[in-house]
A protein has these predicted regions:
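Conserved functional micro-motifs across diverse proteins
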Residues: 1-151
């Protein structure tokens, strides 16, 4: 995969391809540190969206996400849900240097198959920026509902 080696999207100009535009998390650094688990799960009819949050502490931060490194395991049935892709991108692997976003929270949004009814406890295997982690979570603790838009 041949990506630009460094991206400065602080001005979010039209020249930057859409798949590289950086979306910042709708939270403060304090809210991030107060989270029990640095992730949200949104259940939709056709898919499950898992948003993992990463603190960007440096002026230049290497973002490296490969969908093959992510899975959800139902702790009761041992069913495994493999990551389908990165939300908003056709790429299965993205890697780039994020510049000028020091002290911000970066969301990594991953698409999974829809979770079966009755799923309560999950193990989420992650590997962002070559840091493997497993989060054991209760679905009700990390379930996030998007605000409604009323017209």
């Amino acid at each position: 995969l041949n990506l630009e080696s460094a991206i400065d999207d602080t001005k979010n100009t039209a020249k930057l391809p859409r798949k590289y535009r950086t979306k910042l998390a709708p939270m403060t650094i304090n809210e991030y540190y107060e989270m029990r688990h640095p992730l949200w799960i949104e259940k939709h009819k056709d898919f499950t969206l898992v948003t993992l949050f990463r603190y960007v502490g440096l002026d230049c931060y290497r973002v490296d996400v490969n969908v093959d490194n992510f899975k959800i395991i139902d702790m009761n049935t041992k069913d495994t849900y493999k990551c389908r892709g990165i939300y908003g991108s056709n790429e299965k692997h993205i890697a780039y240097d994020l510049m000028n976003h020091q002290h911000t929270i970066l969301p990594v949004e991953l698409v999974f198959p829809p979770l079966e009814d009755g799923v309560e406890k999950l193990a989420i295997d992650t590997n962002i920026d070559n840091i493997p982690m497993t989060h054991i979570v209760s679905l009700k603790d990390v379930l996030h509902k998007s605000p409604k838009i009323i017209r």
